[in-house]
From Swiss-Prot:
Keywords: Cell inner membrane, Cell membrane, Membrane, Polysaccharide transport, Sugar transport, Transport. It comes from the Bacteria. CDD domains: beta_Kdo_transferase_KpsC_1 (cd16440), beta_Kdo_transferase_KpsC_2 (cd16439). Pfam families: Capsule_synth. This is Capsule polysaccharide modification protein LipA. It is a peripheral membrane protein. Involved in the phospholipid modification of the capsular polysaccharide, a strong requirement for its translocation to the cell surface. It comes from Neisseria meningitidis serogroup A / serotype 4A (strain DSM 15465 / Z2491). It is found in: Cell inner membrane. InterPro entries: Capsule_polysaccharide_synth. One of its GO terms (biological process) is polysaccharide biosynthetic process. One of its GO terms (cellular component) is plasma membrane. The keyword Cytoplasm does not apply. The gene is lipA.
């Protein structure tokens, strides 16, 4: 969590509770369909007709609001203008991505400088802004720059080999074009001649500089028109038409010229000198070089006054904007949205390109598909490598395989020099077994190997070895650990809490059984790879201990191999806990001895001593007793760092109903609720009908 997030959340909620609820007429069906609109507008009951209306709500200055504005005028009702917030979403609205923030204006709208707006009033009042608000603004600005966040967040970073990143580049000036029909131009005192003036001025004022013109990608492909496209055919002028993350672009130029684009304000956030030629909301306050002739009249009429960048940011992003918590759909804060967008932006960048999923069953396709539903991922399913060999692959194509990947898929990728991604269930997965066709809330996607393969470094190992964990990670990891341990959450959350506690003074050792043909044993436990051999070795090394053997739930349910007969188990174990859930067993154990079981990680979360006979992902970091060396893992970790890398940075999580991305804390909360609902059902032996019904539901959702 961010440092000020909880405080800001409380302030926002308190302010909303004070509002008197009124009836709002919203004629626009599109506005009414915005997810969680009632949360964003808590002061209103929302109606689609005007009967009994006490206010009217519309979208900015769009022509579609004429009806709503006319109704408000005729009935002498206040009109509320909404618009997308300045940190909106991962993908574009036209692509179906809903807003996580909106602005609410009961006076005008921020891009219309022909009259006052609520944002303008907030900025004018910013000289009395509390120090706490300014501190929050400073932290939020830093996070936005750190994570390269903007209104939309799907665009790739400026490539490493781009000329703008060259250390020997000349002085660079960025001119920001806009598209015809942009209302911020019309209501910002500008037209085509304004863009021509800006362009010529930039050339004249920077005779030695390279000039880069940023236009919209839709302009070059003919979908939209820009103002500067025809003017760039000049020496030292370059056209930037590709989609590029705005912050990464702005950080690599020296000076910026714009008319009314929001990128102008982002240039100020990046510390770049900015010259404006229109009347954007951030002009006239003394933070930019403003050339529009009406700036003076705004100052004379006291609609502008000296304000600093921090005050402008605080007014626009903290006070003027409203936010959802994207993980829960509840009222949120700027920091909730920053945190969420930073996470899903990393995921989008990780999955960018064309992904070919080869030879996967319909069930696993249905399970996997929602995890790859991000703007820049083009997921395609294909039945075999033979069919894939006939496909003309794009330059950004990769192959996606389940687990470590079938040998034929791995060999095909190597032979054709195609990068291979691997995926697997996450570590807090579901209430119910995967072999019982219960879909997961989390998956891991690994571009290096896969976490259970100790033969080669995985992305998780890289994260644990190299990630610069910060205080935010520390706080989130501790909170997550507390949630999981206090609510007894594990990977599958199955089994009964009925367990005969050992009555002994001996050291109690828990030995979790595993699925013997599991890839984690094949690639992570070269010396001991059978449950019976593990049990025998633990007894030989601990002759005086009280040993509890816990068979793997997939083995108990009859779905996988690894069974030990009762007689063999009794030869080395004092007790076998077949039906008990693993966390109940952990409560009574002093130590856990395992090959590669995830139980070892869950034991570390609960402060237990762990001995590893194989090389699981959590071994080798100084937190476990390891029988096998793994020199690659040279970093000594604290437990919270292991938690952060394993549960926060490595997996992806989705909501089981909405299929939208969520964070680890929200996933844990969902599992807690699901587990409480199924307390009377241990979940190990799921009936055939229940399996098929669940499978049909999942398949249906995936193809909706």
């Amino acid at each position: 969590m961010f440092l000020f997030s909880d405080g800001l959340q409380s302030i926002n909620n308190n302010n909303r509770r004070k509002r008197i609820v009124k009836n709002a007429y919203i004629p626009s069906r599109g506005i009414r369909k915005i997810p969680h609109l009632s949360t964003l507008l808590p002061e209103f009951h929302i109606y689609k007709d005007g009967k009994g209306a006490e206010a009217v709500v519309g979208w900015g200055l769009r022509p579609t609001t004429h009806k709503a504005r006319a109704f408000a005028t005729e009935h002498q009702l206040p009109f509320i203008a909404l618009e997308d917030g300045f940190l909106r979403s991962l993908g574009l609205g036209v692509s179906g991505y809903p807003p996580y923030s909106i602005v609410y204006d009961d006076i005008g709208i921020y891009y219309d400088t022909t009259r006052p707006s609520r944002l303008e009033q907030l900025i004018l009042a910013a000289d009395t802004m509390p120090s706490e608000t300014l501190a929050q603004a400073r932290q939020a600005m830093d996070f936005i720059l750190q994570h390269h966040l903007s209104k939309y967040n799907h665009a790739p970073e400026l490539s490493d080999d781009h000329p703008l990143r060259s250390p020997s580049k000349s002085e660079t000036v960025l001119i920001i074009d806009q598209t015809f029909g942009d209302m911020a131009i019309q209501y910002g005192g500008a037209d085509a001649s304004t863009f021509e003036l800006m362009f010529q001025t930039a050339l004249n004022e920077n005779p030695q500089a390279d000039i880069w013109v940023k236009t919209h990608p839709d302009v070059l492909c003919g979908k939209k028109q820009g103002y500067l496209t025809q003017l760039v055919q000049q020496h030292r002028v370059h056209l930037l038409a590709e989609d590029i993350n705005p912050i990464s672009l702005l950080q690599n130029v020296d000076k910026v010229y714009c008319v009314t684009s929001q990128m102008g304000f982002e240039a100020l956030l990046c510390g770049k000198p900015l010259t404006t030629f229109g009347l954007p909301w951030y002009a006239g306050w003394g933070v930019s070089d403003d050339r529009h002739p009406k700036i003076g009249s705004l100052i004379q009429t006291q609609r502008r006054a000296p304000r600093n960048l921090l005050q402008l940011f605080a007014a626009a992003y903290l006070q003027y904007s409203r936010y959802l918590n994207p993980n829960t759909g509840e009222a949120g804060s700027l920091f909730d949205v920053i945190d969420y967008l930073a996470t899903v932006k990393r995921k989008n960048d990780k999955l960018r390109g064309e992904l070919y999923c080869v030879g996967m069953s319909l069930w696993k396709r249905a399970v996997a598909k929602p995890f790859f539903n991000v703007p820049s991922c083009r997921l395609k399913f294909i039945s075999s490598t033979q069919k894939l060999a006939r496909v003309k692959l794009s330059d950004d194509a990769r192959i996606l395989a389940w687990g470590n990947g079938k040998e034929a898929i791995v060999r095909f990728a190597e032979q054709h020099h195609i990068p291979l991604l691997r995926m697997e269930d996450g570590f807090i997965r579901s209430v119910g077994l995967g072999s019982n066709l219960v879909p997961p809330l989390s998956l891991v996607t690994d571009d290096m190997s896969i976490y259970f393969n100790a033969e080669t470094p995985s992305r998780l190992e890289y994260i644990l070895q190299n990630q610069n964990f910060d205080d935010q990670d520390f706080q989130t990891a501790l909170k997550l650990q507390k949630m999981l341990t206090e609510n007894h959450i594990s990977k599958y959350n199955v089994g009964s809490s009925d367990f005969t506690a050992p009555s002994t003074d001996k050291t109690v050792i828990l030995v979790p059984g595993q699925v013997e043909d599991d890839a984690s044993i094949r690639y992570g436990s070269p010396q001991i790879y059978r449950n019976l051999d593990l049990l025998r070795t633990v007894r030989e090394r601990n002759p005086n201990a009280y040993i509890i053997y816990k068979p793997h739930p997939d083995v108990v349910s009859g779905n996988r191999i690894g069974h030990i007969s009762p007689d063999d188990a009794a030869r080395y174990a004092d007790q076998t806990a077949e039906q008990a859930d693993i966390l109940t067993c952990l409560q009574y154990a002093d130590e856990i001895h395992t090959m590669t079981s995830l139980t070892g990680f869950e034991a570390l979360l609960r402060g237990k001593k762990v001995s590893c006979y194989g090389l699981p992902f959590y071994a080798g970091w100084g937190l476990t007793q390891d029988l096998l060396p793994i020199p690659r893992r040279s970093r000594r970790l604290e437990l919270w760092q292991l938690v952060a890398g394993t549960l926060i940075y490595y997996p992806d999580y989705i909501h089981p109903k909405t299929h939208q991305a969520i964070n680890a804390e929200t996933a844990a909360q969902i599992l807690i609720r699901q587990k409480n609902m199924q307390k009377n059902n241990n979940g190990l032996h799921r009936g055939c009908f229940a399996k098929k019904l669940g499978k049909i539901k999942q398949l249906y959702r995936s193809f909706k």
